[in-house]
Each structure stands twice: as C-alpha cells, then as structure tokens.
Amino acid sequence: MKGSNRNKDHSAEGEGVGKRPKRKCLQWHPLLAKKLLDFSEEEEEEDEEEDIDKVQLLGADGLEQDVGETEDDESPEQRARRPMNAFLLFCKRHRSLVRQEHPRLDNRGATKILADWWAVLDPKEKQKYTDMAKEYKDAFMKANPGYKWCPTTNKPVKSPTPTVNPRKKLWAFPSDSSRDLPSPKKAKTEEMPQLNFGMADPTQMGGLSMLLLAGEHALGTPEVSSGTCRPDVSESPELRQKSPLFQFAEISSSTSHSDASTKQCQTSALFQFAEISSNTSQLGGAEPVKRCGKSALFQLAEMCLASEGMKMEESKLIKAKESDGGRIKELEKGKEEKEIKMEKTDETRLQKEAEFEKSAKENLRDSKELRNFEALQIDDIMAIKMEDPKEIRKEELEEDHKCSHFPDFSYSASSKIIISDVPSRKDHMCHPHGIMIIEDPAALNKPEKLKKKKKKSKMDRHGNDKSTPKKTCKKRQSSESDIESVIYTIEAVAKGDWGIEKLGDTPRKKVRTSSSGKGSILDAKPPKKKVKSREKKMSKEKSSDTTKESRPPDFISISASKNISGETPEGIKAEPLTPMEDALPPSLSGQAKPEDSDCHRKIETCGSRKSERSCKGALYKTLVSEGMLTSLRANVDRGKRSSGKGNSSDHEGCWNEESWTFSQSGTSGSKKFKKTKPKEDCLLGSAKLDEEFEKKFNSLPQYSPVTFDRKCVPVPRKKKKTGNVSSEPTKTSKGPFQSQKKNLFHKIVSKYKHKKEKPNVPEKGSGDKWSNKQLFLDAIHPTEAIFSEDRNTMEPVHKVKNIPSIFNTPEPTTTQEPLVGSQKRKARKTKITHLVRTADGRVSPAGGTLDDKPKEQLQRSLPKATETDCNDKCSHNTEVGETRSSTPEMPAVSAFFSLAALAEVAAMENVHRGQRSTPLTHDGQPKEMPQAPVLISCADQ
C-alpha cells in the first residue's frame, strides 16, 4: 500500500497540474495520513481525485497517455503531475459509470461514491490498481528522476504576503488623507496577526472585514494598534484593530477620556455611537472632534447630532463654530437631563458622561485639526441645510431610505428600539435609519450600558430634539454625499468602514449583532460573518456554509441581544430593546434564514462543497453512496420532489436506505453497498488494469452507483435480515418511510406484537399463532383485524394512520423484511430470543429469507396481501408504536431534514422502541444497528 500511497501522492501531483491551489490542500493528506492505507487513502485520494476529475474520464489508454504526457510536461517539477495512485486510477476508470448512474452528481459527489466503493473493494481488486499505480509511478519517476513530492508546500507560505500587501494597499488607499501613516502601520500590525492567524483571505473581502479583522487582531495587539493610530489621531485604524468591545472596555476603563480622541480612535464606531446617543446633544461640539477619528457611522451620528444642533439653530443659520457651540449647549442641556436620568439609573454613567464632556472639550482643544475637518463637514452640511433645509431633508430622507435599507436590516434591532422609543417622532420612516445607525452601534457595543444610554439619549432626543430624526437621516445623507468632500476620517472610514458599510451592511449587521451579544468572542467571529454574509450573496453553497457558521453567531447575537435586552430593562426601555433586538437577529437571521432555510435544508441534507468536505465522515459517505448527498443540484431537485411528494416521500425515496444506514452505521453501510459492486468488480477484474478498467467499465454499469447505492442496500439486507430489519426500524423510526414502516411494521410490529401481545394477548406464542393471527386480531384487536382485512384496501388508510406509510414505492425495498408466515415466526422467535445471533449467524432465518427477499422486495407489495394479517397487527402496533416514533420523528423530519437530526431522532426512537418493545430489537435495531453495519459489510465481503 505504500506504493499505492506514493502513487496517490504522485497522482495527486500529476492530476493537480492545472489546479495548484487544491494541491496544497491535497498534500496535507499524504503528509498527515502517512500511509494509513485504505481509509486514509480513500480520503486523500478523494481530494486528489477531485483534482483529477477532468483527467479521470480518459480511460485505460488515457492512463498511459497521461504517463507520457506527464513525463513530457513534468520535466519542470511544478508542471509535473503526480502519477495517479491506485484510487485515482480506479476513479478514472469508474467515474463515468458513477456519472451515468448519477448524472446530477458533481465531481465531488461522484468521488465520494467512488471512494466508498473503493473502500469496499476487495484487496484483490485493489491490488490490481495498486500494481498499476506502482508501475505508473515507476515510469513516472524514471521519466522525472528529479521529481519532488511536495514542491508546492512552500507556495502557500508565499501567498499570504502578497495578500497582505494588497491589504496594505487597501488600508493606505482609504487613508490617503490622514491615514497614510497609521494605515501602513495598521497593515503591518494586522499583517503580523494575519500571518500568525492566517487571516490573509479576509483581506480580500473588503474594508469591513478588514475592520473587524483589525479589531480581532487589535485584541491580540491592542498596544501596537493604539500606538499606530494615536499619532495621527486617525482613529479608524485603531477602531479597526480593536474589537468594538475591546475599545469599549478601554473607554469604560479609561473613563478619563482626556485622550478621548485617541481612545475613541480605539473605541469602535458602535461605542462612539453609544457615546453620541448617550450624550446625543451633549457631545455636540466636543464629540465632533472625537468623531473625526471615529468610524463613519460615528461620524454620521456626529453629523446627525450636528444636524440636531443645526436644526435647533437652523432658524439662526448657525455656522460650524456656532453649531459647535450649540452642540456644546445641547451637550450641557442634554447632559443635565441625562444626568438626571443617569443619576436615576447609574451615577457612574453620569461620571462617564461628565468625563466624556470633559474629554470632548479637551478633545475640542486637543484636536482642533480634527475640528477643522469637522468644521468643513459642518460647513458643508450647514451650507446644504441652510440652502434648502426642507428640500434637502426630503432628499436626504429619500436617500436615507435608500441607504438605510441596509441599515434597517443591520440596525433593525436598534432602529426598532429607537422606533419604539420614538414612535412619536415625525419622520418615522427616516428615524429608524438615521437613529438606527446612530444608536444601533451603541446597542451592540456597550449593549447594556450603551443601550441604556441610548434610550436615555433617545429620551433626551425626544425631549430636546424631535426634529433630530429628520436631520439624523439628513445628516446621514449629507455625510454620504459629503463622504468625498468630507475627507477626514469619513474618507478613510468611509472607504474602509462606510463605503463598505453600504456594501457590507449585512456583514455589519451580523457583526454588530454578534458583537452586541458576545462582544470580544463574536468580534473574532464577526469577520467570518461578514465574509460569510458576502459569501451567502455570492453563492448558495457558500450561503449554506455560511448559514451553518453564521447562524450560530446569529443565534449568539440573538441570545446576546436577548441578554442585552434583558439587562437593559434595568432602568431603560428594555422592552423595545427586547422585541426589537430580538427582532434584529430575526431580521439578520431572517435574511440569512431565507437562504439559510433553503441552504440549511440543503446543508443538512446534502451540504455544500465545504460542508461536504467537513462532513467527509462515514455518514456523508453513506449518504453519497446512497445517492442522498449526490450534489446540491440533486438536493435541490430532491427538495422539489420532496415538496411535491411531501416530507415522507422525500425521506422515503431519498432516505430509505440512507436513513437506516445512516442510523445504523454511516460508514459501514455505505461501504456495504459499495462492496457489493466491488465484489462484482472483483469478478470482472482482469490481470491488467486496462482490462480491468475495460471490464469494470463494462461491468460497472451493471453495478452502477445506483445499484451500488440502492441494490447494495438490498444485498446487505439479503445477507442480513437483521441489517434490513434494523435499517427498516430506523426507517420506521424516521416515520416518513411509510412503506418502509409498513415493512418495518410487519417485522417490527410482529416483534412489537410479540412483546405487546405477550402482555396484551396470549399471542406470546404468536409464532404458531401467526396463522391464527387474524383470529387473535379479530378477538383482541378487531380494529387490527379490520386493518388486516382491509389492509390491502386499507394500506392507504394505514398510510394515513401510519403516517409514515405514505409511500408504497419504497416498500419493494423495505417489504423485504416482512416474511411469510412461518418465516416470520422463525424470524421473530430468533430475533426475540437471539437478537445478537440473528445479527451474527441466525440471520439465516431472517437473513436467508431476506436473501430471497431482495427479489421478494419487489413482490413484497403482493406478499403484503398475504402478510396483511401480520401487517394488520403490525400496522396496528406500528400505529401504536410507530405513531409514537413518527410523532416525535416526523416533526424532526418535517422540521429539519438535517441528517443529524434525523439520525438522532432515529437513534433515540430506536432506543425508545427497544425500550418500549424489544420486538424492535427483534429486528435487532438497537443491537443490530451497530452489528448490522459490521455484519452487512462482512456479508457483502
């Protein structure tokens, strides 16, 4: 196998010629899997084979041609393709067959099937491929004596630096004005952590992700970030470097904001918003200075406050300085009001705000340059507002609506909170957006205190500035319109923070939501969320992955927001927060969840490429082998089918074998199926790989992956009644498989009856009494007798009653289990008395019949008429027992098609059934579940 493994490596290399990026991943397998033989080979080869997919349709001649071609091309090491390993040869040989069977499968799905199949191959069959691979490798090495196996491992190391360089450019680009110094510093600071943490990829995601990444890295390197940002007071760099929570911690810890501008540089825009909202009018002129360095959102809040002050003084048409003075006045007024409220709630907050005022004043003094910028902004805004305050307001309101659509979602929680706080405000349409932006960050960053401050500030705003909402929106618009004109941090922040905000409001939504709840923890996650949110937009597969990954953050944010809302009630309108904030995660999760619901379903059932890779376990293999996880497209089609057929049909058609194999044993089950084919392939095998390939190509269609998936299931069942029984109980446990459940009903219910009727009826000797079953049923369970009589006609009724029995079509496969009269008696007795034995050796009573049953499976629908008697009790008992299982299981199935949920439900149901009625164990579900896979695989072998 070493040779084959080496061949794998070579083949991976040879096949990876055009796909360098994958090969670096592929190399991990040979390096990590150090020749663990079959299983490691399978997975390694799967990955490598994915690279090879294009090559693998070449055919037997293609292999040798590849050798020649690779030899020609391989003279340069990097261009040389690794010689195909045994598995790759196998895949190349059989991929077309899998394709024929599963036209909708993507290469990955086909490779998974091939890998499962390969795992099931007999060593003899594999030996042919390994020999061929050795020959291939020898020829390859002769052709390329200097060939090295891992030339590409160094490449990934190189890639991070170029990625970091663009990031420097990205940082420097927005920071052209005042950030040129901090941005390179920042880039360096982030580069260091990126190299350490491998954050290079998100750099390409855009400024927002970079911001969050910077925040995350700032957590690791806050000192460096603070040092870098403070020189220029351009605070966005530090904002980016420090997570909003960390910045918040800094601010709260160092409430003496004498360095407020620098500290606020560190403070995230959200915290700054919190400050603004808490000090809404108060921070007025003082905060503009702080805001200069603050994120664009904070600047927007600043502008909103300025607009408030200007609005207050609009009649006077105050100038920028006047607006600052007005802001200071407003600060004092608002602060007095807030101090009253703050004293009620938290004197410490009053102190903080007082410190904020002091720091704001100090900042006004310290950061006159920033003020100049702000004055420019204010002048611009003032000019705009002075020109046409009403018209501009309207325009800005419209713009706000446009621009705030994102903010709506991103800040829906805070916006709703604000709305609930400000229902009386005039420009409701605009408020949510402007206010959302201003206060949402606060709600998310300081979540508790900030939200309290927010609400207080909202209250203050209600009292002081009812006109502010319009201007918040208005200012926000003006800030957008002035982004270019307003060069101070908005430009840097706008490009990094703000421009992306438009693009990445959704990312920010999630980031903020997450940051609100989990703070620093989520701070690490938010970048992922941003990336993921973008990925969601990019593709459903990514969205499915992102949904999985991003949903936890969403839920976290939800729980966090709930916690926050729960905490906010302390002295504030926590109620608006609670519903609104809860509403925010819904909106976020809602946005994600539309896709997520579809993607989630797909993910759970099939999984996107990434999810599949992560799911590469036995379960996934079994699912793929059974055709369950063929591909996203197949999943979509399956979803459509399931929607048409109904969940039960979906489960039945798609899940029959999968469900039981899944619950029984993902890996062994799938391999079982594949082994069936491989055996036949072994029969086909010829001395030469070419002949083997040809024969296997010819023979594979016979054992096509479908057969491999579906027929193999019957074969294991044939070999093992127990396996079938266990699989069927699993199916029944999943409830949607009505036909399966009927069959399971037959066996399980017969067993079930055995146990139940032992208590219920003298049918403890039901083995003999099965012939008299109807009599007993009539006497004991007239309804069952009715079912038995009517079952031919009543099967639909049973389907109704046995909700899972919707599908008869799956029955052919599942009907295998019900045995005829004496066979059933024997099977039940053996299963009841010898659960393990049935799995091991006594499968013959059940298993031998089952061997005949694969054929009978198709006929099972007919035997059902005869078996209806048994089925009657079975159906009745199954109705009793399986309705139990189906009621729990069906909801799980209907609610989520996630394989994990179904597996858990099935497992739990099997356990419960085993507890409820060992008859289920007759099938050996619980006991055989583990054994069945092993036995099945052995039987197949």
Swiss-Prot record:
Biological classification of the source: Eukaryota, Metazoa, Chordata, Craniata, Vertebrata
Binding region for DNA: 80-148
One GO MF term attached to the UniProt entry: RNA polymerase II transcription regulatory region sequence-specific DNA binding
CDD domains: HMG-box_HBP2 (cd21989)
TM stretches of this protein: none
Coiled-coil region(s): 326-370
Key word RNA-binding present: no
Biased composition (Basic and acidic residues): 1-18, 177-191, 499-508, 536-552, 758-771, 866-882
PANTHER family: HMG BOX TRANSCRIPTION FACTOR BBX (PTHR13059:SF10), HMG-BOX TRANSCRIPTION FACTOR BBX (PTHR13059)
A cellular-component GO term for this protein: chromatin
Function of the protein: Transcription factor that is necessary for cell cycle progression from G1 to S phase.
Bias kind Acidic residues: ranges: 39-52, 63-75
Cellular compartment(s): Nucleus
Name of this protein: HMG box transcription factor BBX
Major localization class: nucleus
Claim: Ubl conjugation is one of the keywords in the record: yes
Bias-annotated ranges (Low complexity): 661-670
Biased composition (Polar residues): 723-742, 805-817
UniProt-listed Pfam families: DUF2028 (PF09667), HMG_box (PF00505)
Modified residues (Phosphoserine): 243, 478, 485, 704, 822, 844
Region annotation Disordered: where it falls in the sequence: 1-21, 39-80, 157-200, 221-242, 438-482, 499-600, 635-677, 714-771, 803-888, 912-941
